[in-house]
Structure formats: structure tokens, C-alpha cells
């Protein structure tokens, strides 16, 4: 009997919120074993630094569904730089992609989800602008297309039902948003496993 495929999910708190749903959907039908770091993968530089440890702990994946972005594009007054430059973001994505490719896994890139258009932008707290999320998403999409990496557009999933998908903080996913993103992740994973 063939070994059950191993699916690795990488991403920030958005990933952490939909991962249990993805795990349930894929493992209940014995389609895959779903894993992901117990910690938040945060910004792209953090993922780049921690990925070897996570791969060592979690084992070689057959499929990787991955996102970095909101921690890079977000303005955080308690760090320097407050926002990671687009060039640094892309450099980190290239490095992470290179490490993932060395595992032999099929890689899926997921776009970063939007914030609610009414979420206030504050200079004294974490803050995001949708136009900046779009710019970082666009640059990442261009890179992934050049590298022939399939894309799961979670941004479009959430944006199409932004009122129904986002929690009260207008950033994180509520239960409906988690389910919508999990459905899209499962569909993308199944497609590359065909």
C-alpha cells in the first residue's frame, strides 16, 4: 500500500486558524497527513530562518501549501523596520522556495488575505493597507508564476465575502472565513495530488 501523502502548511495566524479544518477534511478520508509548525511562521525572514528546523521536526512533505505576507507588509511601530521592504520580502520568498524545492515536495503559494476596508490605519499599533497587501501579493504572484508554482488565491476567497469572512478585529478569519479558506486549501492540495 502506498504511503499516505504528507501535507505541510506554512503561514501566519491565518494558516493556524484554518489548519484544523484542513486537517479534518483531508485526514478523515485518509487522503493526507496534515502538519504545520506549532508556532506562527510570521514574516518571510522568520520562515526562512526557521524552515530547516521545522522540516527536521515535521518530516519531508509531499505537498507544501505556503504563505508569508501580512507580517511583512504590516506596519509594526515596535520593530525596525516598521514594514519590511518589498525587495527583502521577495528575496526571502526565493530562499524559502529554494529550500522547499530541495525537499522534492509540490509547492503551492497562497496569497495574503485582505483586511476589512473599514479597519482603521493607526500609527501606534499593527496596521495594514489593502493597497500595500495588493502590491506585495502582486510581486509574489509574479515570482511564483516565473517559477511555475501554482497559486491558491486566498485573498480573492476572503475579499469576495469580506463581511462574512473576517472577525471583529477586521484582520483575522472568523469561523466562516476559516471554513472558506480551508475549502480552498483542500481543493488546491487535491489538485496537485492528482
Range-by-range predicted roles:
Residues 117-154:
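Substrate-gating cap/lid alpha-helix
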